[in-house]
Amino acid sequence: MTSLSRPCVEFISTILQTVLNLGLLCLGLILVVFLGKETVHLADVLFAPEQTSKYELVEGLVVYFLYFEFIALIVKYFQSGFHFPLRYFVYIGITAIVRLIIVDHKSPLDVLIYSAAILLLVITLWLCNSKRLKRE
C-alpha cells in the first residue's frame, strides 16, 4: 500500500473542507428561510382572533429558538476556524428537551426522566465551561 504525498493529502483535505463549508452555508440559508416562516407562523398564532392554545405559542417559540441556535452554531463554526464548540450542541440539546416536555407532558415519569437529562446536560455545560476544558 502506498502512502499519499503531503501535497496530495492537503489538496484532498482542502476539497473536503470546501464541500463541508458549502454544505453548511446551504444549510444555514435553509434555516434562515425556516426561521422566517416560523416568525410568520408565530405572528399568526399571536394575533389570531380565535383563542389559541398557549402551549402552541410556547412550542412555536421553542422551535424558533432551535432554528436560531442552529444558525448561531453555523456562524460560530465559521468564526472559530471551522470547528464546532461543544457547548452549542449542549444548548441545542437542552432546548430540544424543553420543547419535548412542553409538547409531551402527559406522563409524569417521562417528564422526570427528561428533567434528569436536562440536569445532566447542565452539568456537562458546567464542566465544558470550567477552566480545564475552556478553549475560547
From Swiss-Prot:
Coiled coil: none annotated. The keyword Kinase does not apply. The chain crosses the membrane at residues 15-35, 55-75, 82-102, 108-128. HAMAP family: PsiE. It is found in: Cell inner membrane. One of its GO terms (cellular component) is plasma membrane. It comes from the Bacteria. InterPro entries: P_starv_induced_PsiE (IPR009315), P_starv_induced_PsiE-like (IPR020948). Keywords: Cell inner membrane, Cell membrane, Membrane, Transmembrane, Transmembrane helix. This is Protein PsiE. The keyword Transmembrane helix applies. Belongs to the PsiE family. Its main location: membrane. GO terms for biological process: cellular response to phosphate starvation. It comes from Escherichia coli O17:K52:H18 (strain UMN026 / ExPEC). PANTHER family: PROTEIN PSIE. Pfam families: PsiE. It is a multi-pass membrane protein.
